[in-house]
Amino acid sequence: MRDLKTELEQRRAKGLYRSRRVLEGRQTPEQVVDGRQVIAFCSNDYLGLASHPKVIAALRKGASEYGAGAGAAHLVNGHTRAHHQLEEELAAFTNRERALLFSTGYMANLGVAQALLGRSDHVLEDRLNHASLIDAGLLSGARFQRYRHATAVDLAQRLAGLGQTGERLVLTDGVFSMDGNLAPLPELASICTAHQAWLLVDDAHGLGVLGETGAGSLEHFGLSQQQVPILMGTLGKAFGTAGAFVAGSEALIETLIQSARTYVYTTAMPAAMAEATRAALRIVQAEGKRREKLRSLVARFRAGAGQLGVRLMDSQTPIQPLVIGDAVEALRLSERLLEQDLLVPAIRPPTVPEGTARLRVTLSAAHTEAQVDRLLEALDRSMRGSEDVGSR
């Protein structure tokens, strides 16, 4: 048997031990975490909707009408009018024929890959894809390859080398969760079309944030359902609620209803959550000012960091990583910020590659300019005198 205690101590010694913090109250920038009042720069609540009064009111009303839980899978009697209306509204929002709700983005990705692929098929993934996409590819049983990060030429070469046998599924993040950069989706879409490959875009961090109406990375690039046949979006980030969906053609969605095990064999999300998400969707569509404010805060943070000599990764999204390199040093910098009542967790291997431990700053429309300036001042104080941190 494995010596689990020794393995845990080794992880701790390398600065890779993970610990949970306990949040009291709502998901807002000002939080009480482990009994300490902090300003958090680590939430994915990009538009500040998790605590929006209209979203909360819709959740309460939905619970009053439908109860606390769905009670069954969608294919038994857990699929309510609220779920059905949300699916129709998400399909219209993303300009796809149909949409299908899943309990989480992780389950959505696993379900699609399992439903479409078998042992004689091929799955190709960006090297920096989210863990759920990697697991989806591996667990599908298909022949698995990774192409160089955001490198369309490498993908094209790998697809060309597959011959004519088997289905091909290409999986990519729309916005990469640890780097904040966008995948070259127009190039990937063109290559997939040329090689008759499915393309799935996981737009967990683009939906609600990018595009004129907030419809995400595909709207940002102007890509149609024909160009990107499979869109996966999550609802627990910019929408501020929970769950996920897959959007695409009528035939795709019906295939998933019949064959996606993570859809068929699990209880539906609570209908009250579907109602809360419908309210969030209306806000996403109606209040473009939230995206405008978010873009303004991102620009302010990047300009301020540049003035301080802090080199950030090339990202124009709310994800603003500061690569430190060493995991222990990243933890130390995170602790220095926490001492100043700022919560910016260190992200370490295996979440990111070895030697690229980082602080992952995430911004929200709920932040104020004063809070962003406070973070910049704290970074300046914490990093002053350190030659190795953040390439200063």
From Swiss-Prot:
It holds the Pfam family Aminotran_1_2. It comes from Thioalkalivibrio sulfidiphilus (strain HL-EbGR7). Pyridoxal 5'-phosphate binds at G105, Y106, S177, H205, T234. One of its GO terms (molecular function) is 8-amino-7-oxononanoate synthase activity. Disulfide bonds: none annotated. Homodimer. The modification N6-(pyridoxal phosphate)lysine is found at K237. This is 8-amino-7-oxononanoate synthase. Its EC number is 2.3.1.47. It comes from the Bacteria. The keyword Ribosomal protein does not apply. PROSITE patterns: AA_TRANSFER_CLASS_2. GO terms for biological process: biotin biosynthetic process. Pathway: Cofactor biosynthesis; biotin biosynthesis. Coiled coil: none annotated. Catalyzes the decarboxylative condensation of pimeloyl-[acyl-carrier protein] and L-alanine to produce 8-amino-7-oxononanoate (AON), [acyl-carrier protein], and carbon dioxide. Gene3D superfamilies: Aspartate Aminotransferase, domain 1 (3.90.1150.10), Type I PLP-dependent aspartate aminotransferase-like (Major domain) (3.40.640.10). Keywords: Biotin biosynthesis, Pyridoxal phosphate, Transferase. Substrate binds at R18, H130, T351. CDD domains: KBL_like. It catalyses: 6-carboxyhexanoyl-[ACP] + L-alanine + H(+) = (8S)-8-amino-7-oxononanoate + holo-[ACP] + CO2. The keyword Transferase applies. Its cofactor is pyridoxal 5'-phosphate. Belongs to the class-II pyridoxal-phosphate-dependent aminotransferase family. BioF subfamily.
